[in-house]
Curated annotation (Swiss-Prot):
Keyword Ligase in annotation: no
EC number(s) stated in the UniProt entry for this protein: 2.5.1.46
Keyword Transferase appears in the UniProt entry: yes
Gene name tied to this protein: dys
Domain of life of the native organism: Archaea
Protein name: Probable deoxyhypusine synthase
Required cofactor(s): NAD(+)
Active site, per annotation: 308
């Protein structure tokens, strides 16, 4: 009979690897030095540390003149938050080559160049908020006057799009529509446009794809515009954008896919990479769960099974709120 002590204190094999270790605060003097420990802390800190190393590798290759085309995908709530300014900076500095987002990621970026969103609270009387005309995104408040102001700009913008389409003899694609929106911002808006993703994408000629561009306030404005003008036709071409997006992946020597959240932007990017045999580098930041079979919760390894991420790709998934980790990730990579 085996003794209880022998069961509890069973001999183990030696394990080779990195010792778990955090920063000794007397020995660090900056956030940068603290982040240097992340890969050794464990749990999601280790995943963030790996993401830092992956993105640094991509940046080092690009600095040497090697082509790694960077695809950035994010859901609308990312732009609702203060991550908008970080993404705008990345575009301004030439760190991103292709963007895919949802309709909210477009319209909220434009609206914030008109009036800011306001920090609120999670615990409020939402029925009362509705009576007051204040919309809520988590603990971020968006008064309806933001959308009223947005409409004042969108109606003349739609008129311009109609003229462009008439001159061209064909509709704009969604990415061209967004590019023209950036041009419109450049002409019509003040200094606040300089913190806009759309504005800098226009200035740096970075395509922004939005396959579901009507799924939000832009769609609402299009509805009003079309209803009020009867048979006047404004068309946004989605089909040709899928060709453009896929070819941006196919023609790249290597690609990196950085995805905040899930849904449509995530799949549009990795599916485009399917046509080249998968992306070479992938960083996912998500709070979605994998066990419901959703695309949003699918880990990078599941993407390998579809051929959307290369089997030998360098990838990591961080289970965390992007507002907590993305600023640290960008700050550390770009300072390095």
């Amino acid at each position: 009979m085996t003794e209880p002590k022998d069961i509890v204190l069973k001999e183990s094999e030696e394990v080779e690897g990195t010792p778990i270790e955090g920063p000794w605060l007397d020995e660090v003097s900056s956030l940068e030095e603290v982040l240097d420990y992340y890969e050794r802390i464990g749990f999601q800190a280790t995943h963030l540390g790996k993401a830092i190393e992956i993105w640094k590798k991509v940046e080092e290759k690009r600095a040497r003149g090697e082509e790694v085309r960077v695809f950035l995908g994010y859901t609308s709530n990312i732009i609702s938050s203060g991550l908008r300014e970080i993404i705008a900076w990345l575009v301004k500095e030439g760190k991103v080559d292709v963007i895919v987002t949802t309709a909210g990621g477009i319209e909220e970026d434009f609206i914030k160049a008109l009036k800011p969103f306001i920090l609120g609270d999670w615990n409020v009387n939402d029925a009362l908020m509705r009576e007051k005309g204040i919309n809520r995104i988590g603990n971020i408040f968006v008064p309806n006057d933001r959308y009223i102001e947005f409409e004042k700009y969108m109606i003349p913008f739609f008129e311009r799009v109609l003229e462009i389409e008439k001159e061209r003899g064909k509709p704009l694609t969604a990415s061209e529509f967004i590019y023209e929106m950036g041009r419109f911002m450049d002409e019509k808006l003040g200094k606040e446009k300089e913190k806009s993703v759309i504005y800098w994408a226009y200035k740096r000629n970075v395509p922004i794809f939005c396959p579901a561009i009507t799924d939000g306030s832009i769609g609402d404005m299009l509805y009003f515009f079309k209803e009020e003008r009867g048979d006047r036709e404004l068309i946004i071409d989605i089909a040709n954008d899928i060709v453009k997006l896929n070819n941006l992946a196919v023609t790249a020597k290597e690609t990196a896919s950085i995805i905040l959240g899930g849904s449509l932007p995530k799949h549009a990017i990795i599916n485009a990479n399917l046509f080249r045999g998968g992306t070479d580098y992938a960083i996912y930041v998500t709070t979605a769960i994998p066990w419901d079979g959703s695309l949003s919760g699918a880990p990078p390894s599941e993407g390998v099974s579809w051929g959307k991420i290369r089997a030998k790709a360098d990838y990591v998934e961080i289970w965390a709120d992007a507002t907590l980790v993305f600023p640290l990730l960008v700050w550390k990579v770009m300072r390095s």
